[in-house]
Amino acid sequence: MSNKAVVVFSGGQDSTTCLFWALKEFDEVIAVTFDYNQKHRKEIECATSIAKELGIEHHILDMGLLNQLAPNALTRNDIEIKAGENGSLPSTFVEGRNMLFLTFAGVLAKVKGAKHIVTGVCETDFSGYPDCRDIFIKSLNVTLNLAMDYNFVVHTPLMWIDKAETWKMADDFGKLDYIREKTLTCYKGIVGDGCGECPACKLRKNGLDKYLESKKN
């Protein structure tokens, strides 16, 4: 099997951790970032900067049609960022995003002769997003294999760990400070520790605090 991987890469904490994971697991790593007209272009700038610094082949694919089909708080200024209520999904959920991203990552992987696809989705902290579930990833893996007659393996290194354990993984790679300072998780587009107020920043900070506290014990 080809020892080459394509990493779905946003420039955020999770995908950057997965990028470092892939660099340890595979001989060749390619990063792919999707431009879906997200409000904060800084996300793409972060991904580009990190890929360049690490000397990784990097592709940016235009997925602007996703914004046309599925308006959400990550692409529209007139939609408030808020958690889901009464069983509804959070306003930050982008319908079909992971399905489309992984499908196009699969197309790129096959063209590049890569068998492995890496994504940072996580069921532990999935915030109610249905396309972050393990059952979805396994199902899509089978579908991609059938659709392209190709033996892909979709890897989800973070699937069963929480944010504290994700920080531990980064620390084990010797990259905790790098990921803390250079990645963008914040819904308000602030690099590093972010605004500290949005749901993404709170999840990230709580995980970091929990991990750093565990190191003292």
From Swiss-Prot:
* Cofactor(s) listed: Zn(2+)
The free-text note explaining how the cofactor binds reads: Binds 1 zinc ion per subunit.
Q: Name one GO molecular function term.
A: ATP binding
* Keywords in alphabetical order: ATP-binding, Ligase, Metal-binding, Nucleotide-binding, Queuosine biosynthesis, Zinc
The biological process GO terms on file are:
queuosine biosynthetic process
Pathway participation: Purine metabolism; 7-cyano-7-deazaguanine biosynthesis
Query: Which EC number(s) does the record attach to this protein?
Result: 6.3.4.20
Q: Where does ATP bind?
A: 9-19
* Reactions accelerated catalytically: 7-carboxy-7-deazaguanine + NH4(+) + ATP = 7-cyano-7-deazaguanine + ADP + phosphate + H2O + H(+)
Annotated residues that bind Zn(2+) are located at 186, 195, 198, 201
Q: Does the keyword Transcription regulation apply?
A: no
Tell me, in a sentence or two, what this protein's role is: Catalyzes the ATP-dependent conversion of 7-carboxy-7-deazaguanine (CDG) to 7-cyano-7-deazaguanine (preQ(0)).
Family to which the UniProt record says this protein belongs: Belongs to the QueC family.
Q: How does it assemble?
A: Homodimer.
Q: Write the protein's name.
A: 7-cyano-7-deazaguanine synthase
- The organism is Clostridium beijerinckii (strain ATCC 51743 / NCIMB 8052)
Q: Which gene encodes it?
A: queC
